[in-house]
Amino acid sequence: MNPVYSPGSSGVPYANAKGIGYPAGFPMGYAAAAPAYSPNMYPGANPTFQTGYTPGTPYKVSCSPTSGAVPPYSSSPNPYQTAVYPVRSAYPQQSPYAQQGTYYTQPLYAAPPHVIHHTTVVQPNGMPATVYPAPIPPPRGNGVTMGMVAGTTMAMSAGTLLTAHSPTPVAPHPVTVPTYRAPGTPTYSYVPPQW
């Protein structure tokens, strides 16, 4: 144990050996005993919030304990407006700005927190999120050999293929090859000037 620090036993007033001045109201000693613990913070009966309920009555809490009146009827089943909480829909976004049929669009949704830097406001993404182009299926062959008529066999169409007139061959196209610069030292410098 630290010999310099030797705490006094509880309940013993602090001996002010050095005569240090304390501000007004500072206790010069410990209280004799702590006040007894009371489980009820507010003593007495509270008529608004009963601690129990009468046996035999249906157990329910009134919507407004003070008056007992029922809150006014709302025709909307959802107390929150739809625009406050954007929900991702399973259907494409029905937006007048999106080209229907050409693009698949995602519904408008609030940006996730990692997108919004150093702000506390949920900022929607403005446009109906990413616009995906409609997928174009790759062309697939119909399984018919080139030159054959569908529904025939090779034996039936081979005679027509062999005797069919072949077009006259096309003359080779003249190709001009540009003249390239002769290899050697370039006329410009790769190193920028050092000022």
Swiss-Prot record:
Fetch the PANTHER family from UniProt: MYELIN-ASSOCIATED NEURITE-OUTGROWTH INHIBITOR-RELATED
Name of the protein this chain belongs to: Myelin-associated neurite-outgrowth inhibitor
Primary location: cytoplasm
User: Where are the annotated coiled coils located?
Assistant: none
Q: Which domain of life is it from?
A: Eukaryota
Subcellular location, record wording: Cytoplasm, Perinuclear region; Cell membrane; Cell projection, Axon
Residues modified by carbohydrate are N46
Q: Give the sites modified to N-acetylmethionine.
A: M1
Tell me which InterPro entries the record gives: FAM168A/MANI
Q: Which residues lie on this side of the membrane: Cytoplasmic?
A: 1-18, 165-195
Describe the function of this protein. Inhibitor of neuronal axonal outgrowth. Acts as a negative regulator of CDC42 and STAT3 and a positive regulator of STMN2. Positive regulator of CDC27.
Query: Gene Ontology cellular component?
Result: axon; extracellular exosome; perinuclear region of cytoplasm; plasma membrane
Residue intervals passing through the bilayer:
19-42, 143-164
